[in-house]
Amino acid sequence: MTKSELIERLATQQSHIPAKVVEDAVKEMLEHMASTLAQGERIEIRGFGSFSLHYRAPRTGRNPKTGDKVELEGKYVPHFKPGKELRDRANIYG
């Protein structure tokens, strides 16, 4: 599901709320989550999961075109850990 599809589905389900208001709310929520992570803070949504930053240590990689070794710097990457309820709901398909 894309962001546009999410906005469309929410606007359809909440027909009393104008689609533009739904779109603005979704965009604002995602922007707030991104800025919270950028500040190094953790986000926890009970029953859904948590978002945090994990550190990737420096390592030696390879250029896929040439095969040459490339030194990659350490960096922080976003990480999502699903909550138990989400794992249980997703497991009905497994």
From Swiss-Prot:
<comment type="function">
    <text>This protein is one of the two subunits of integration host factor, a specific DNA-binding protein that functions in genetic recombination as well as in transcriptional and translational control.</text>
</comment>
<keyword id="KW-0238">DNA-binding</keyword>
<comment type="similarity">
    <text>Belongs to the bacterial histone-like protein family.</text>
</comment>
<protein>
    <recommendedName>
        <fullName>Integration host factor subunit beta</fullName>
    </recommendedName>
</protein>
<keyword id="KW-0233">DNA recombination</keyword>
<dbReference type="GO" id="GO:0030527">
    <property type="term" value="F:structural constituent of chromatin"/>
</dbReference>
<dbReference type="GO" id="GO:0006355">
    <property type="term" value="P:regulation of DNA-templated transcription"/>
</dbReference>
<keyword id="KW-0810">Translation regulation</keyword>
<dbReference type="InterPro" id="IPR005685">
    <property type="entry name" value="IHF_beta"/>
</dbReference>
<dbReference type="InterPro" id="IPR000119">
    <property type="entry name" value="Hist_DNA-bd"/>
</dbReference>
<keyword id="KW-0804">Transcription</keyword>
<dbReference type="GO" id="GO:0005829">
    <property type="term" value="C:cytosol"/>
</dbReference>
<dbReference type="GO" id="GO:0006310">
    <property type="term" value="P:DNA recombination"/>
</dbReference>
<dbReference type="Pfam" id="PF00216">
    <property type="entry name" value="Bac_DNA_binding"/>
</dbReference>
<dbReference type="InterPro" id="IPR020816">
    <property type="entry name" value="Histone-like_DNA-bd_CS"/>
</dbReference>
<dbReference type="InterPro" id="IPR010992">
    <property type="entry name" value="IHF-like_DNA-bd_dom_sf"/>
</dbReference>
<dbReference type="GO" id="GO:0003677">
    <property type="term" value="F:DNA binding"/>
</dbReference>
<keyword id="KW-0805">Transcription regulation</keyword>
<dbReference type="GO" id="GO:0006417">
    <property type="term" value="P:regulation of translation"/>
</dbReference>
<comment type="subunit">
    <text>Heterodimer of an alpha and a beta chain.</text>
</comment>
<dbReference type="GO" id="GO:0005694">
    <property type="term" value="C:chromosome"/>
</dbReference>
